[in-house]
């Protein structure tokens, strides 16, 4: 079963700069993917090709020098997020994807793997020195992925998703020999398939005539 905990980060000046570059790259790649899709798919009916865009990232890194400082898998994550946004749009559970703005409240980037804790610090790719973390709760399980975010207050947090290794408790099977059917009615409140009856509560008895009158009244309309 997957669970998630969020922790406060205390990056130094150099780490803040690199975190902000990762956040900017996530927004940059997402917007480029959306722009490429919009320009080649004006009628918005062609499925989004996430794999094709991911293949173009190495070439993009040659043209945009600072992208070389970013973890390669963190560069792929925005394309996958955009793909999920298009899937929700096709299922009509959300609107058409919009371009991301650096002025929006919460900014973040995704780290799919190679996430460790060492001596009170968070170790992730591209960060030579671990980031100081307030590890207020131990993680008992295998780390699956992490998301580092910057809040409007300027504070940084990391959300760690991990697998507890414990599956959800299955529901007990329904046995035919222990199952009965129940009918609800006006005369008798409840009648089981075995013939047992439960009388109506007093408040329902007192209002039975009103219920019948109302039923006849609206059945004529």
What does each model-found stretch correspond to?
Residues 1-221:
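Nucleic-acid substrate recognition interfaces
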